[in-house]
Amino acid sequence: MKEQDHDRLLRIKTEGVREWQHQSSHYNRYEATPYSALEILFDEYDEWKSTDRFVDFGCGKGRFPFYVYHHLHASAVGVEMNGQLYQEAMENLAKYMERAKSSRASIQFEHIFAEGYDIEKEDNRFYFFNPFSLQIFQKVIDN
């Protein structure tokens, strides 16, 4: 299935690459994880539970949280520092919720730097797709 077909199925728009001018070298461009990679990840590691709570650091437009909820019915939090991407994730959430089978889909987005996100006790699965430098990664891990 093509990227746009997956997006259409989920009623979201996450395709594309976005370079940022005047951005710190610690934060990388926007590029969503390919759906084919997500399929491999979830096929390879089948120990996921619907009670898990996934946190996607550098979630961009939210592809990973929507994929997690749609396929596992697990909670997902997207953490995004870029205001424009955060807004697009929120627009995707509104579109997803319009036609979601459950109006209580547990997907949320936080507009905050990854190193500022407070890990909650429910958070037990963490996802990173090249969102930032090793220095920022270390700060997140220290949390």
Predicted regions located by residue number:
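A short SAM/SAH-binding and catalytic strip from SAM-dependent methyltransferases
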Residues: N124-Q135
